[in-house]
Amino acid sequence: MRRRSALIATGVTLALVTGGATTSAFASTPASEAVTAAAVADTTPAIVAATNAFLATLTAAQKTAVQFAWTNTTQKKKWSNLPQGLYTRSGLMWGNLTTAQKNAWLAVMQVTLSPAGYTRVRQEWAADDQLASGGGLQYGQQYYWIALIGTPSATTPWQWQWGGHHVTVNATISGTEVALYPSFIGAQPASYTSSGATVKPLGDIWTSAYALLSSLTTAQKAQAVRGSTYIDLLYGPGQDSRAPSYEGIAGSALTAAQKTQLLTLISGYANLVNTEDAAGRLAEIQATLDQTYFAWYGPQTSAGNSYFRVTGPRVIIEYSPQAMGGTAANHIHGIYRDPQNDYGAAITG
């Protein structure tokens, strides 16, 4: 049964420091439960209400800075994983907002994302506070930006955009549909301590990917493993028009149990969005699972310094370790796309 937790979109007071009570953002939804459908309330009115509540906290100058026309295709695609100092973003910077304004924006994120997705994003965001600014580069939660493209509406399309170093969420809302693609899902450091607990924002995703690799036979690994060292992202910022690269092992070559494991891996991304939209999202992916490929570059160990990619008609996922700044396994770049629905192409007409 699909469930939607009750969430009040306004009047929410949220802590501005991510807690570290869990070691990873969430346990992925089992594939056997992920695509069961039932009637649930439309999420869009709550997202619109929360966004309008956020706008009501802003000054006239701030509203002008944060709002862009729906026809502004440049702003829709203006995002990067680079830190402040290497990339110029537009909108409102988090560090310049009041506490009331911050809490109002967090309510927008919380109603758009699932509880688990919100936790993952907050953990990735908080990781940036572990990095030291210097050399003209600035790191930390204060250097994340908010932009609104179009007018918040329950009927006509619009987009909210939030991001900074290693994390970007592009949320396109059109009627009852919410699309979170493309989004940059990374972390540096990939493991850190908060309130005495170890936090691994992407730990469950790595575990799911390695479990899938480990389940493959020698013959299957010959198809899936494409190289002995990790590679960089193919579908990162600025690669919106790049055609999908289908390589690795196809879903059609997997056993039923392995297909379940592949769906479990994918659910770590598909479940970023609220429960209502996540169920439909997983159904789309499951319908084309036989044409969805899993590829691996790097050591076949659990060390975390390997790249993997999931590529299908409805999903592109990349996980790419980076050597810059220390151990590759502790610096992750990641992407989540839908080749048919990036920036809501399939739902905005």
Task: Kindly label every feature range from the protein language model.
Residues T23-G349:
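A cross-kingdom marker for long, charged
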